Amino acid sequence: MDFNTSLRRAIKTGKVILGQNETKDSIEKGSAKLVVVAANCPAEFSGYLSGKDGVKTYTYEGSGVQLGRACGKPFIVSALAIEESGDSDILTLSR
């Protein structure tokens, strides 16, 4: 399954948190199983992630606009956290 399909399935059947601040909260609570960041995610947030051991991350090849579209949202999404994957295989796709 490709990433966009896996992401959509996770959004529909699991628990996905959108936005940098909400993603940080999810990481701090220990709820984030996978963090996805857009290729153009701000360096400040990328630096924050690099200091978090044990957090699986996936860098989406597109921009925040494209990641938002992949989520089915009409707005920019520069970061998101997968807390529950639902029926998706997205947790196997980290890189």
Curated annotation (Swiss-Prot):
Entry GO terms, CC: cytosolic large ribosomal subunit
Sorted UniProt keywords: Ribonucleoprotein, Ribosomal protein
Disulfide bonding pattern of the chain: none
GO MF, any single term: RNA binding
GO biological process, one term: translation
Similarity annotation: Belongs to the eukaryotic ribosomal protein eL30 family.
HAMAP family: Ribosomal_eL30
PANTHER family for the chain: RIBOSOMAL PROTEIN L30 (PTHR11449)
Name used for this protein in its record: Large ribosomal subunit protein eL30
Name of the coding gene: rpl30e
